[in-house]
């Protein structure tokens, strides 16, 4: 990233990032299309009614992961491998804690949120079932986004895009299997999406394990207030920005 035409390098790095983030939102579009074909119009409407509610959580996760990865890219750039490993370890711990808390909050507010958005009664049950299942997979989504953000911080924007492409194809296959063959309906579509995200995480994790920089030792897992504070200062404002955008979309 420091040698060559800056504009070309930025475009080549940013394009996979944009496509990968957009790809995560396509999961729900695939779910909606297959559910609409296999179950019916009401099921299609139920999935569609959850769009902004789920994107709110997804965008918060993406923002936090990207913010937490900024110090990692800094330490990578200056060649400080010790602090880099510590920042990676701290990112994992923060994502685990925030992921658990976010999952609990989202599961609690799912029903009130759909009510607040005036979801029609005839599709409310299906929308709630889909949203609860998707919210139940928040830790998996956060794990993928953190792994992908770490890879990007190390200059690898292609692996997360490949992971999303593989997961996207898997999501469609599982949608067809769970919805049309097994007859699981809306629940099947949500389970397919969560499973596809899990596959995307495993792919990124597998690639990370190949890197010598990722040989994190026991001492690296110690809590370091300065690193955690720096990551939170970067991640939370980004998350707040995405929350405001999502709330605007809901309104």
Describe the predicted segments one by one.
Residues 29, 38-41, 75-78, 153-154, ...:
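Helix-loop interface residues and adjacent transmembrane-helix termini in multi-pass membrane transporters
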Residues 45-104, 141-160:
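Small-residue-rich hydrophobic transmembrane alpha-helices
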Residues 1-14, 72-139, 173, 181-236:
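Short alpha-helical transmembrane segments in multi-pass integral membrane proteins
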Residues 17-70, 134-141, 229-251:
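Transmembrane helix-bundle signature of multi-pass secondary active exporters and lipid flippases
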Residues 29-32, 104, 112, 146-150, ...:
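Alpha-helical transmembrane segments of multipass membrane proteins
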Residues 95, 150-176, 187, 191-194:
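Alpha-helical transmembrane segments of multi-pass membrane transporters/permeases
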Residues 144-147, 215-223, 241-250:
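Juxtamembrane/interfacial segments around transmembrane helices
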